[in-house]
Amino acid sequence: MSEPFILTITNAVATISINDAPHNRMMLDYIDALEEELPRLRDDERVRALVFTAEGLEHFSVGMNLKQFGEGAERKGGADGLLDQRLRVLNMIETLGKPSIATLFGYCLGGG
C-alpha cells in the first residue's frame, strides 16, 4: 500500500493530501499517521498554516473504510477506542494554533 497521505511544505504552508484516489477513504493508517504527524507540524516554526486536500479529481473523501472498522476496533480496544482516536485527531487539528483549510470536492463524508 502507498503512503496514507502526501505531506509537502511550501512557503510556510503544510499540505496534507489523502493518498487513496479515487475515493480517498479514511484508512486506519491515515488516522495513525495524522496522529503522529500533527504534533510535529504544530511545533514546526516553518509551518504557519495547513491545507487538507486529496489526490485525484473525483472525491475529497467517501469517509471511513468500513472494511477496516472491525480490525481497527480490535487494534484500538473496541469501537470506542477507534472513535476516540478519530476525535483526538480532530481535536489536534482544532487546537493546532495554526489556520487549517480543507479544499473539498466531490463527496466529503465522515464524522467530525
Regions found by a protein language model. Give the residues of each.
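Glycine- (often His-adjacent) and acidic-residue-rich active-site loop
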Residues: 54-92, 108
